[in-house]
Amino acid sequence: MKLTHRPLAFLVMGFVWVLLACLIGLALFLGMTAGRPYGQVFRSLHVHGALIGGVMQIIAGLLLAGREHRTSQPTIFMALNLGTLGLLIGQAHGHFPLMSLAAIVLIGAFVPLRGDLVRQIRHSIVGAPMNYWFYGIALVSLAGGLLAGAAVPLRLMPYNLVGQGRLVHIHLLTQGFVVLMIVGAMHTQFPAFFNGRLHSPILGQLTFALLPLGFVVLLAGFLLTNLWVQIAGGVLMLIGALCYSYNIVRTWQDAGRPRKPASDLCLIATLFLVIAITCGILVSVNVLEGQPFVPFGSLHLAAYTHLTFIGFMLLSLLGALTDLLPNLLAEDRTTSNKKRGPYEAALTGIIGRWSTVQLWTLSIGTMSLAVVAALVWQYPLNAWPVKAAALAGALLLLTGLVVFATKLVQLLIEDPDQPSAS
C-alpha cells in the first residue's frame, strides 16, 4: 500500500514509534529487575521516541484528520520524524548542536497545526470560557515543554536548575499537553462511538476547570519545591479526573453499555488516569517528613509513571485509532460510496479481532509494573517472585502490542477490490 502524507501516515508512523519505544522500554524494565540497568541514553531514547515520535505524532494525525479536506502534509510529517530522529541521535552521541536543531524543527512542526488546535477549541462540547482556559493551558504547555526541552542543549538554563527544568519539561508535555488534549478530545469522541451525547455538560465544565488548574498548581509546586503545593495541585487534578471518569462511564451507561473495542479501551484508560493521579499524590505524601515512609526508587518511579503513559495515554490513543483507522483507510482507498461502506465494515471487523485479549493483556501488563514495584518492598530484586512477575508483565504488554500491530498490518494490506475473509 502507498501511504501519502495524509493523517493516516501520521497515525501509522506514530504507532511504529510507540512500538519501537515500547520494545526498548520492556528491555529497560527487564534489565532493571535483573539488576543490570541500561544507561541514561536508552532511557532517553525510550521516553522521547514514545512521547514525541509516537504520542505527539498520533495527536498531530488526529488533529489533521479533523480537517474538512484531508490534504497531504509532507512538511509536517518530515519535520516530526526527522526532528525526532535528530533528537535521538543527538542524545545518543551527546551532540548538543544536533539536539538544538532537532528541537527547533519539532517546534516548527507544530506551528502549522495552530489552526487545527483552534478548531478543536471551537468545536469543543464544553463551551466558552472553559474551553479557552482548558485548551489555552494545553497550548502553553506544548510551547513551554518544547522550549524547555530546547533550553537544556542550548545551555540557556543555569546548571543548578537543569534538574527542575527537565522535570518541568516532561510534565508540560505529558500532563499539560498530552493528558489535557486526550481528555478534551474524549468529551467529543467518546459519545461519538455510540452516536450519543455526553452525559453531563456540567461535569465536563468542572473537568475543564479543575484539571488545568490542578496542573498549574502542581507545576508551581515543582518550581517552588513545595510538597504541599504539589499535593494541592494533585488533589485538584484528582477531582477533575473523577468528574471526567464518572462522566465517561455514565455516557457509556446511557448508550446501553455497548461492547465496542474502541470504547472498551477508553473506559479502562479513565480508570488508569484516576489511579495514576492518586499514586502521584501518594508519592509526594511519602516524602513529606524528609525521610520516605516507604522506600521509593527508580523501579517504583517507572511503575508509577507508566500508569499514565501506558494505562491512560496508550490505551486512549489505541481506542481512537481503533475507531478512526477503518474510516480513513476506506476514504483513502475507495472512490465509490457504494463500495466504501462494505469495505469500511470489513476493516472494522479486522480491527475488532482479538480485542478482549488486547485490552486485558495491556491492562494487566500495566498493573503488573506496579505489582513488581510492590514486591520489591518485600523481596530482594533478584528473588524469583520479582523476576517471575516482571517477565509475566513484559510478556503481557508485548502480547497486547503485537496483537494491535498485527491487526494494523492486516488493515494496510486489505484490498478493497477483493472480497474480505472477515
Where are these regions (language model features)?
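Hydrophobic alpha-helical transmembrane segments of multi-pass integral membrane proteins
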Residues: 1-422
